[in-house]
């Protein structure tokens, strides 16, 4: 039987092999190749090829500004943080929308269905093109910009779609408040479980000596809540906090950490920067516990799902996380991890101390971690997406 032709669109994607940009769209595209002929359409970047085969996936990058060296709206990071970092980048937004629409219109007859990742800009642009599409809400595209013209555009996007998915139940609830599409499903992000594991352990990778390693991986931005994790180190001994990531709060958090280390008279916090997928595999495997202290940001943005927690699970790490956004879909308190309230500094420290100092609890969470990860393997997630797409196409 002839495979369907699937176009996957997004605005976060690796620019080249070994890039530190999130790769979940790439991994999904690779897994979907079992069911469809897959092409990915993403914004151009000065560091990326206009078209290439990346890890077996056909990738097209569209230009959106006459001066290509100024196409800096989407990378590194994401659109909203990039604008916050440099306000002038907001001038690139209309160019991006227009160019995305033009490319989607030009390609409208080449594909049977489009999978638009993020309502803004992909879903909204797609709603003005005739090709059938499903749209997936990932996080800030759902929880922020929900007034005025953006709410109307989001409603149009959800109404015109042949199907709507969200990566977590809390996000789906927000989408349903905007518009209830009869074809909707919660399908989380996935993880290549075969890629991660304790076999990638490297001894004394962080120069921690005999200290336990507490790991955070993610963008250094407000909603990640890293400042509360750093404060929690006041109440934790014989451990090193390793922070892997980059972002607008790096300088502020580094100063906070230096002050903390000075007060404790030890090197208990280490920043290692953004790392590649390959490097992260050993970083997870060489750590003892993973912490995700996310919060609701001032603009309403919150964690959509928390893919790094899934990678930590796949690496056999106990996870401690905030009850925030889509995290609660993945982490079940005292079953496969521990949950604390947002901004609860002593709560974070208490849970870390309990898990690290109680071998029975630690081993129980380690066993549950790997079991949880296997439920979210990309083969499982790709089948869910394919079944959903087949269902909505038939209707």
Describe the residue ranges of each PLM region:
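N-terminal subdomain of nucleotide-sugar transferases
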Residues: 1-63
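Short hydrophobic beta-strand element within catalytic cores of glycosyltransferases
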Residues: 309, 314, 318-321, 331
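Acidic anion/phosphate-binding donor-loop and adjacent secondary structure
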Residues: 68, 145-148, 173-176, 182, ...
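Conserved acidic donor-binding segment of nucleotide-sugar-dependent glycosyltransferases
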Residues: 330-334, 338-345, 353-360, 374
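A conserved mid-protein helix/loop that constitutes part of the nucleotide-sugar donor-binding site
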Residues: 23, 212-235, 248-252, 346, ...
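Short alpha-helical donor nucleotide-sugar binding micro-motif in glycosyltransferases
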Residues: 274-275, 283-287
């Amino acid at each position: 039987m002839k495979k369907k032709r699937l176009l996957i669109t997004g605005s976060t994607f690796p620019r080249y092999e070994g890039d530190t940009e999130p790769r979940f769209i790439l991994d999904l595209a690779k897994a979907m190749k079992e069911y469809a002929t897959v092409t990915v359409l993403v914004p151009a970047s000065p560091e990326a090829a206009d078209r290439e085969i990346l890890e077996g996936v056909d990738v097209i990058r569209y230009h959106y500004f006459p001066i290509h060296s100024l196409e800096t709206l989407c990378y590194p990071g994401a659109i909203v943080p990039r604008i916050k970092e440099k306000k002038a980048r907001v001038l690139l937004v209309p160019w991006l929308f227009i160019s995305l629409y033009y490319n989607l219109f030009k390609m409208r007859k080449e594909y049977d269905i489009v999978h638009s990742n993020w309502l803004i800009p992909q879903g909204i642009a797609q709603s003005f093109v005739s090709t059938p599409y499903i749209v997936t809400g990932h996080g800030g595209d759902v929880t922020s910009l929900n007034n005025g013209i953006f709410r109307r555009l989001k409603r149009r996007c959800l109404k015109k779609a042949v199907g709507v998915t969200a990566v977590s139940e809390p996000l789906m609830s927000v989408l349903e408040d905007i518009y209830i599409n009869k074809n909707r499903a919660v399908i989380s992000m996935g993880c290549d479980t075969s890629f991660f594991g304790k076999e990638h352990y490297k001894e004394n990778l962080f120069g921690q000596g005999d200290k336990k390693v507490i790991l955070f991986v993610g963008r250094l931005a407000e909603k990640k809540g890293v400042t509360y994790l750093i404060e929690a180190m006041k109440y934790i001994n014989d451990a090193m906090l390793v922070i892997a990531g980059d972002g607008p709060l790096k300088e502020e958090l580094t100063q906070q950490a230096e002050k903390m280390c000075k007060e404790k008279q030890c090197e208990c916090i280490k920043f290692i920067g953004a790392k590649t997928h390959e490097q992260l595999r050993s970083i997870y495997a060489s750590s003892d516990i993973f912490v995700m202290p996310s919060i609701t940001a001032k603009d309403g943005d919150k964690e959509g799902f928390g893919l790094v927690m899934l990678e930590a699970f796949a690496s056999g790490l106990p996870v401690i996380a905030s009850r925030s956004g889509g995290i609660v879909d993945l982490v079940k308190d005292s079953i496969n991890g521990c949950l604390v309230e947002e901004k609860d500094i002593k709560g974070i420290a208490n849970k870390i101390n309990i898990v690290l100092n109680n071998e029975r609890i630690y081993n129980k969470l380690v066993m549950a971690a790997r079991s949880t990860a296997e439920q979210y393997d990309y083969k499982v997630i790709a089948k869910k997406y394919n079944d959903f797409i087949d269902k909505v196409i038939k209707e």
